[in-house]
Amino acid sequence: MKKILVFRLSAMGDVALTVPVIRKVIETNSELHITLITRPFFAPFFFGIPRLKLYFPNLEERHKGLKGLYRLFRDLKKMGPFESIIDLHSVLRTKMVTFFFRMSGTPVFTIDKGRAEKNRMIRTKKIKTLQHTTQRYADTFLKAGIPVQIGKAPYIDYSTEAFQSSRSYLLGKIPEKDTLKIGLSPFANNAPKIWGLENFKELITLINKNHKAVFFLFGGGEKELKLLKKLEQHSENVHLVAGKFTLSEEIAMIRMLDLMIAMDSSNMHLASLSGVKTISIWGGTHPGFGFSAIGQPVEYQIQPPEGFLTCRPCSVFGGKPCIYPTPSCMELIKATELYKRLVTLNVLNPKPRNE
């Protein structure tokens, strides 16, 4: 039996993107056992993966600070011996813990995030498609002598209980078999990545004019939930999912959708990892950085028309404040044009429904 230790603590989308790689590594290496260091909230991403153990460090108490990180190293070392350590996060915390492992004689392999080439793209605005994050993860395993070929979605699984709960809810909201089930995820962590609720209202109206559809609203914290409740009131066929279900149930529900329309956000990743058609809307960030919806056609990436802005992309993750009062890049994406694109792409068609 071979054991390896893998680190990826955050963020939500980045942790989700480890799933295709870890699942495939486990599938193709029957003797391998993986311990993944991550956060408890992300546990549903890894449901059903055999020989995978999740470990949740207590970074607020027991494993806080330098002494705490050394304690984390000691706690993890007791779970070994590990053949190798794979750091898919490469931040100060993981660098410290992996340093202790390296000093104890355990080989450590760290992700190459491509920071220099990403920063060069921001500085020069010369756009090219960089390696996808999942491939960077796979390459890190390759450094450790574990080759992996990422397969096709769906990658994320869910429990029977989550499926039954989600299916019951969804079918209760769908009046007819040939009704489109569309997920909407209007929010992201930063303003330059948000299209705006008024645009979504207009898009809902346009779709309702020509299609039988039901819309399900995903994502958002406490502040965003209040805004999503207002969006829910826009039409009787719009239903708020966020805040009502567990993450496992949301994953199961996403899998049943015909289409997800999302920002550059974790729900974009969850939908594409679930094998659902995913339309992603990009403003201040850019899919070329390697965080695009995995397995989705380039045509599904909605971006501002070229030639109007010289400031895009402004940052890798959208954390840099926009130089304009409101993100001009998002204002250039019109609901009418997005609707036309959906029609052209032929994505407004419901999947066959089995009773």
Give, region by region, the residue ranges found by the protein language model:
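Catalytic machinery of carbohydrate-active enzymes
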Residues: 1-355
